[in-house]
Amino acid sequence: KYQSYANFNFEFNKVIKRVNEKRYSDLIFICIGTNKIVGDSFGPIIGEILKRNVKDRKIKVIGDLTNNINSKNIKNIKYNCDNPYVISIDSALSDTIEPGNVFIIKKGLVPGSALNKKATAIGNIAIKGIVAKDEKSLIKNYYNLKNADYKLILKFSKNISKIILQSIKFLNL
């Protein structure tokens, strides 16, 4: 189910409440994507913003504009904590949902699936930001990711980051 910013804010606050109730040791954000492809920069931009603003040592951010996380290197991530709650963040394509919408899925995500890449699902939940249309064609999808609207993705990433940063203020790890 896709969500407006208000709905995303509500749903993400429910996630933080669940993390508080279950007593996880750490909160880890895996921000997937690359700054080399505009449409795939949603995760790294969020990672960059979170890294600059998160001061709690129990909240870790993996993946940003300098250190990209992708379907190849994701399997090498080490959490170095006992019982983390992992939130993966990535760009997504959709043939029915307009770019600029966001949704939370209650399972991990498989990075690179829009380009038929094989990887292991990662995360307790995932935040997916729709950045372009899914054409059901590898070549067209790659083209859509390369030519996505940078201003939309930058604004979109900043708004989602702001909601995340406001919500994690209520985290009790």
What name fits each language-model region?
Residues 1-173:
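N-terminal catalytic or cofactor-binding beta/alpha core of small enzyme domains
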